[in-house]
Regions:
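Active-site nucleotide/adenylate-binding loops and adjacent lid/helix of ATP-dependent enzymes
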Residues: 2-9, 84-181, 222
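Conserved N-proximal alpha/beta basic substrate-recognition cap immediately N-terminal to
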Residues: 6-116
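Short glycine-enriched loops at secondary-structure junctions
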Residues: 62-64, 83, 199, 245-249
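Anionic group-transfer/hydrolysis microenvironments
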Residues: 108, 141, 175-176, 187, ...
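Protein kinase-like catalytic core scaffold
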Residues: 136, 194-195, 240, 253
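A short glycine-rich, hydrophobically flanked beta-strand micro-motif that places a catalytic Asp/Glu
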Residues: 173, 184, 237-249
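C-terminal active-site "lid" helix and adjoining low-complexity regulatory extension at the edge
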Residues: 233, 247-286
């Protein structure tokens, strides 16, 4: 059996290489030849038929255009192009979660603007602050590892952040103070919660391990697991890292979902190798 692991052309750090090696080893152990491919390796030409035969593709990139082209030409992707798109764009993600009646923070989408105009009118920011108060969480539509997520403690800080964002799409959310610097990463594969990890960061409102947080194996309440599974299903994901916050009354609130989670830290803190679980799931669902 032959498959591809499609990865980003420009992300070549040791962290990513280690993850790719974990996946390759898991599939090789199961008799699958897993070739690592980038967009350049496959084809950049829109009107060219991609004719190499593979049994399936693990799509570990966020190149939605490539994912769509591959599916249009008959390739089976894990995760699907649509699922990756919904996770990659936070605006689409929260809209889909809201449509499915899944508990998320109160979320407001900034009006559309364009390069050169930027967000020249800021009355909408005042309107949001009047409704949900301060601090205000500001998230760019695209971003990973918490790097495009900001906390504004005043209108002045919010305006400075929006100045930096320029004309890029962003959203605003209520700040969940009860979950400051902590959340639960629930790793889901095939609509099953495989292992969960409590992530904490005492020096930041974001819990990301890449920002200095730590992790520990954790057994969440069933309602947290149920919400994570419901959210995963709503976005059509085969596997995902689901980040769940602690609400003010200890109720679960979805922070976000990741279609290609960096699970080396999960192995480090829980001893569970998600590459093995993903490999078994895919081979049982072809």
């Amino acid at each position: 059996m032959k498959a591809w692991l499609v990865v980003n052309s420009f992300m070549n750090s040791d962290k990513f290489k280690h993850l790719y090696e974990m996946l390759s080893l898991a599939f090789n152990k199961r008799g699958v030849s897993l070739d690592i491919k980038t967009a350049s390796d496959i084809s950049l030409e829109v009107n060219k038929k991609i004719d190499e035969k593979v049994d399936f593709i693990i799509f570990w990139d966020k190149d939605i255009y490539l994912a769509q082209r591959l599916e249009e030409q008959g390739y089976k992707l894990f995760n699907s192009a649509k699922a990756v798109e919904l996770c990659d764009n936070k605006i689409l993600m929260y809209q889909a979660l809201a449509t499915a009646n899944i508990r998320i923070p109160r979320t407001f989408i900034a009006p559309k603007t364009f390069e050169g105009l930027n967000y020249s009118k800021r009355d909408f920011v005042n309107g949001v602050i009047k409704q949900i108060g301060l601090p205000l969480v500001i998230k760019e539509a695209y971003g990973s590892f918490g790097e495009q997520v900001y906390l504004a403690n005043s209108l002045e800080e919010a305006n400075k952040i929006i100045d930096q964002i320029g004309y890029k799409d962003f959203l605003m959310q209520e700040y969940i103070a009860s979950s400051k610097g902590k959340d639960i990463r629930i790793n889901v594969v095939g609509n099953k919660a495989i292992v969960s990890m409590l992530r904490e960061n005492k020096n930041d409102f974001r819990s990301n391990i890449s920002n200095g947080g730590t992790g520990a194996k954790f057994e969440p309440k069933q309602e947290y697991i149920d919400l994570a599974l419901k959210a995963t299903k709503a976005l059509g994901l085969d596997f995902a890292g689901v980040d769940v916050m602690f609400g003010p009354n200890d109720e679960p609130i979805i922070c976000e979902l990741n279609s290609n989670p960096q699970f080396a830290s999960t192995l480090q803190y829980t001893g569970v190798n998600l590459a093995e679980v993903i490999a078994d799931y895919i081979l049982n669902n072809l």
